[in-house]
């Protein structure tokens, strides 16, 4: 916050910074400000930093994911369209496995293909989220930085009709929950590197387990693999009536 008061947490180790208007204050352009901030974090905290600089949240997040763990990428308005056009559709926030499969089945595999479509066509084919992904495909993201926002967690759970310890059934259910968590995290522009598992036994004993991965994620497969490790440690003769996963 020495650089700007407009800091919005994205996850425990990620944040958006709005550097609009800070050039006059610091007498430096945003790229230099961020380079100095990265150096300071490395020196004082001892962790690597990946920086993405752009004119909206969506592009800044994509930039920050390039060349991790010590990447520094910049996308300006002139470059945005060309940068996005060949990226796979799942890069778009809100495109989880189900929507990705629908798009792919329709022959749409890149962001550039969505950009070429009329917005009404995208909405007709894919529902309300069509407007959202069409705007992102055109590098449009009008969300503002919200400094007061607290780091959020996203979770889904389900209660079974019958208590069970069937491993295949539990893993199938876990995958479905992980997909839901992934889709919601993409829609909200959130990510996390702590995966939480919640299970309730047939005698109503609540068990919570968590695991931390190296990098924040929104990807269902990564969430699932981590949560599955936790689940398999708990499966025994005991039967479960509830299963939940969170990020």
Task: Indicate residue ranges for each PLM-predicted region.
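Gly/Gly-Pro- and Ser/Thr-rich, intrinsically disordered tail segments characteristic of DNA damage-repair
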Residues: 1-125, 129-132, 145
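DNA-contacting surface of Y-family translesion DNA polymerases
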Residues: 91, 99-242
């Amino acid at each position: 916050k020495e650089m700007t008061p407009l800091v919005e947490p994205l996850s425990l180790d990620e944040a958006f910074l709005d550097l609009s208007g800070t050039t006059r204050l610091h007498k430096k352009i945003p790229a230099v400000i961020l380079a100095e901030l990265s150096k300071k974090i490395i020196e004082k905290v001892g962790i690597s930093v990946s920086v993405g600089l752009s004119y909206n949240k969506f592009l800044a997040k994509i930039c920050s994911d390039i060349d991790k763990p010590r990447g520094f990428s910049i996308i300006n308005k002139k470059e945005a369209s060309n940068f996005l056009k060949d990226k796979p559709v799942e890069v778009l926030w809100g495109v989880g496995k189900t929507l990705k499969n629908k798009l792919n089945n329709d022959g749409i595999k890149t962001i550039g293909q969505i950009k070429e479509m009329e917005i009404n066509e995208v909405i007709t084919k894919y529902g309300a989220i069509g407007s959202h992904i069409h705007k992102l495909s055109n590098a449009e993201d009008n969300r503002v930085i919200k400094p007061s926002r607290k780091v959020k967690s996203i979770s889904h759970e389900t209660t079974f009709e019958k208590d069970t310890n069937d491993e295949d059934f539990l893993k199938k259910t876990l995958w479905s929950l992980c997909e839901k968590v992934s889709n919601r995290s993409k829609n909200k522009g959130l990510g996390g590197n702590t995966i939480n598992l919640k299970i309730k036994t047939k005698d109503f004993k609540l068990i919570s387990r968590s695991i931390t991965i190296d990098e924040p994620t929104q990807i269902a497969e990564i969430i699932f693999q981590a949560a599955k490790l936790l689940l398999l440690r708990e499966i025994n003769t005991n039967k479960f009536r509830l299963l939940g996963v969170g990020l």
